[in-house]
Amino acid sequence: MRKKSSFYDNKVVIKPWGYEYTIYRHLNKLSVTFLKINNNHRTSLHCHPKKKTGFIVIDGKAKIQLGLYKENSEYFSSPSKLMIRTGLFHSIKGVSKNGVSALEFETPMDKHDLVRFKDDYGRRKKPYEGKNYSKKIGENFIRFKKPLFGKDQFYKIGKSKVFIEVHKNFKKIINKKNSTIFAILGGKIVDGRGRNIISYGDIIKTGTLKKLSQVFKIKDKLIVLRVLK
């Protein structure tokens, strides 16, 4: 799995609806993919049988279908978040004039853990795109650097501000606005017996972190991706 998926670390994958590329990867545990979906185009209606998936819309507006029925669709404007359980079919459509940009969080990383149920471009039941649909990432593409304690990173993507930070405790995290979105890139929030409450790939807001901080603790260091307007 790692050998096959790591091929995409330095590639842009060309899609009929736009493109995507790996903007960050933590070993084989977590992959963050940048998606650009053009206006009035959508991804296949697909699911991931083995991995947990989360999205943060960082620019534009998306229409996201959950499940097999179109009626189960909602609009998400930037910045907004969504967690998708293992095996749930979903599709994302760009409805803004300039399309939609999103970050996809996959746990664990496996590009080939993909089942396409329906597709506008004839890819139904077909696997993930191979090397014939990829090209080398250009220097103008944003790539997140390795997170280091005391060296926060900042990126402006569309109308969203993206920070990557490393925290030893909750002190600075819980002082953020309640609308702030956090994605966990590394580390864990655990209970008194060391059991995971929140781990890499989870996406939550400040309000949830405030409540969790009253009972649980950060194990070692927590690496977060923070998004706000």
Task: Give the residues covered by each predicted segment.
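Double-stranded beta-helix
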Residues: 2, 6-9, 14-15, 95-145, ...
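A short glycine-rich, His/Asp/Glu-containing loop-to-beta-strand
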Residues: 10-51, 137-179
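Catalytic cores of nucleotide-enabled group-transfer and carboxylate-activating enzymes in metabolic
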Residues: 17-18, 38-41, 46-53, 59-62, ...
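Residue-level recognition of conserved beta-strand positions in structured domain cores
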Residues: 34, 47, 66-68, 94, ...
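Short, conserved beta-strand element in jelly-roll/cupin
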Residues: 36-37, 47-64, 68, 175-191
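A generic "binding-loop/recognition-motif" signal
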Residues: 41, 50, 88-89, 98, ...
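Short acidic-glycine-tyrosine-enriched beta hairpin
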Residues: 66-90, 190-213
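Asparagine-centered strand-capping/turn motif at beta-strand->loop junctions
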Residues: 91-96, 175, 184, 212-218
